């Protein structure tokens, strides 16, 4: 019975983020502000309006937010890719709630994103991973998904170091 329940939870649908999801997304995001960045409600609404792809699993076991090259977004990481690639989809954040970890949600969100990117005629998905402090689990996860490192930077006045990754997707 436990295995069936675990499998059922792992197969929760992937749904588009709606405005009704914003309070829960904001809370989950800000629980992980050290790894991501703190968001205010107005900023989250703006970013979701700019998003190329924003999805959630379940009530909010996990979510992902991405932007294409045309987004009005001032993140130094997004701008790094914009300076180097004419067309791309940038993964801004993927968050999995603590109680939902280990269920494959991040993998499923990325796989669904890759399908969406391909259908949209895009061919490059980009992201960054913190290098300082190091995040070897995220490095390994992105390598397993087929991402390759293409650069690095020190940002926010030297407070943070990141590695930049890309993954080719058949368009």
Regions found by a protein language model. Name each.
Residues 51-68:
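Conserved beta-hairpin
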